[in-house]
A protein has these predicted regions:
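Juxtamembrane intracellular "pre-TM" segments in multi-pass secondary transporters
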Residues: 51-86
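Short amphipathic helix-loop junctions that connect adjacent transmembrane helices
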Residues: 102-119
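Helix-to-loop junctions at the C-terminal end of transmembrane segments
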Residues: 133-146, 233
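Cytoplasmic membrane-interface "Motif A"-like loop-to-helix N-cap segments
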Residues: 143-155
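Intracellular juxtamembrane helix-capping segments at the cytosolic ends
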Residues: 189-203
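A membrane-interface helix-boundary motif in multi-pass transporters
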Residues: 8-35, 231-251
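C-terminal ends and interior cores of transmembrane alpha-helices
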Residues: 155-170
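Multi-pass alpha-helical transporter architecture, strongest
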Residues: 36-48, 245-269
């Protein structure tokens, strides 16, 4: 509902600021997105049954939430591999969230030389492929374990970004589409299996607490990644390909951190 309200506000503001046909296409896409958010939220309201909680207990926990982040980080150290996994997740979420924050679209136009329309089409293709990737990685995670699948996905991400740099440096246009396919497949994949990984490392009675840390790490990475990209591109003037390679370094750091974490659960969840 909140997302739909925000999209509606954006839609109204676009009506006010659109004096030519230049933004008509974007305006129509926002209208479609607004409707889809509402449509796909309906099953959650109709078919997902929530457990009833004692309001007094919930309110007490809410007041304690001011201290929960630091407390949870300290608590996570008591469980083997959990803190290390979260640190590793910060590095790969930093790289991936930097791309999906909108900087990839800029890269495709400014460095790869795609038109705005071609860029949108490639990103749309990547989104469709990500759905397939999520399903495939989910099945693979059940068979091979989330650790192996996470590491494999990180390796694919590194290859994907290196291919993007090669494509733009040597003007091999078709390679950028390979990047889109690999990246799309693995963005769906890594966010499918890393949740399973997280669950295996966390005791059932503290899942909510530690998933709060999981989310906090992702949000913090969303802030830090674009700042790093902007610093490399705009302050150091080293170019977008250097910024892209810096993301490869982040993924590599993440790979070696997570490689040392076992996905064998010590809990019966």
């Amino acid at each position: 509902i909140g997302s739909s309200v925000l999209l509606k506000i954006a839609e109204i503001n676009l009506v006010k600021t659109t004096y030519s046909g230049a933004l008509v296409k974007s305006f129509e896409l926002i209208k479609i997105s607004n409707g889809l958010f509402l449509l796909f939220s309906v099953p959650a309201f109709l078919f997902i049954e929530e457990k009833k909680f004692n309001i007094d207990k919930v309110s007490v926990k809410f007041r304690e939430s001011l201290y929960i982040v630091v407390k949870s980080w300290r608590h996570s150290r008591e469980y083997k591999g959990l803190t290390r996994f979260l640190i590793g997740r910060f590095f790969y979420a930093d790289a991936i969230n930097t791309l999906i924050s909108g900087l990839l679209a800029v890269y495709l136009v400014e460095e790869a030389g795609l038109t705005a329309e071609d860029s949108q089409n490639l990103l749309a293709l990547a989104i469709i492929i990500s759905i397939i990737g999520g399903y495939v990685y989910g099945k693979a995670g059940d068979k091979y374990g989330p650790r192996k699948c996470t590491l494999f996905s990180l390796g694919c991400w590194m290859v994907s970004l290196i291919i993007a740099v090669i494509s733009t440096e040597f003007d091999i246009d078709w390679l950028i589409y390979v990047t889109g396919v690999i990246g799309g497949f693995n963005i769906g994949g890594i966010f499918a299996v890393d949740r399973v990984f997280m669950t295996r490392l966390s005791p059932k009675e503290h899942l909510g607490e530690f998933y709060g840390l999981y989310s906090t790490v992702g949000r913090f990475a969303t802030i830090v990644g674009p700042i790093l990209w902007g610093f490399i591109v705009n302050t150091l003037n080293l170019g977008r390909n250097t910024a892209m390679l810096s993301l490869v370094v982040l993924l590599m750091i993440s790979f070696f951190i997570i490689r040392g974490v076992s996905d064998e659960s010590n809990f019966v969840n």
